[in-house]
């Protein structure tokens, strides 16, 4: 019986392995989106898993940009029927919790720990830029964590500078590839926005008791 090869060389084999991985990421994202919509997963777990899938997707789609220039066509070719995943990965590029963040009311008992979390996330984000950690897959998770912690704090209004600035940066980064890096100008601007938002955040804290 003659052996049938699925690929002709190592490069072709890697391509098909990448296809399989892309297929798996899209399917996993669709499953995650449905679980979130049906309240089968809590928002923080959803956000963490969704961020990982988005970063993996960005890295893989950058690798496959020549062989898979159109992700929707790839999904159609393999009859995937994953509209929620395609929206999340291709159109939005942000977890639903970041895109449609509902202000989470924090009780007095846990507001102090949330404030500490916000401060830590601000400092970590600013320090990472000073250490020249400027790749999208390095910056995006830090800003996403910061955005999430700010949205937990009920004393901050929806239009608080830090919230709007982080949302703008997350949206901008989501349109870039995972391996892309911020330019020196972008890095300086982001650091400035973080510092400005941090100062506004600290100024807002005394209002917590009002």
From Swiss-Prot:
Domain of life: Eukaryota
GO annotation, cellular component aspect: cytosol; ESCRT I complex
Subcellular location: Endosome
Disulfide bond sites: none
Matching Pfam families: VPS28 (PF03997)
Function: Component of the ESCRT-I complex (endosomal sorting complex required for transport I), a regulator of vesicular trafficking process. Required for the sorting of endocytic ubiquitinated cargos into multivesicular bodies (MVBs). Mediates the association to the ESCRT-0 complex.
Protein name (record): Vacuolar protein sorting-associated protein 28 homolog 2
Naturally occurring in which organism (per UniProt): Arabidopsis thaliana
Source taxonomy: Eukaryota, Viridiplantae, Streptophyta, Embryophyta, Tracheophyta
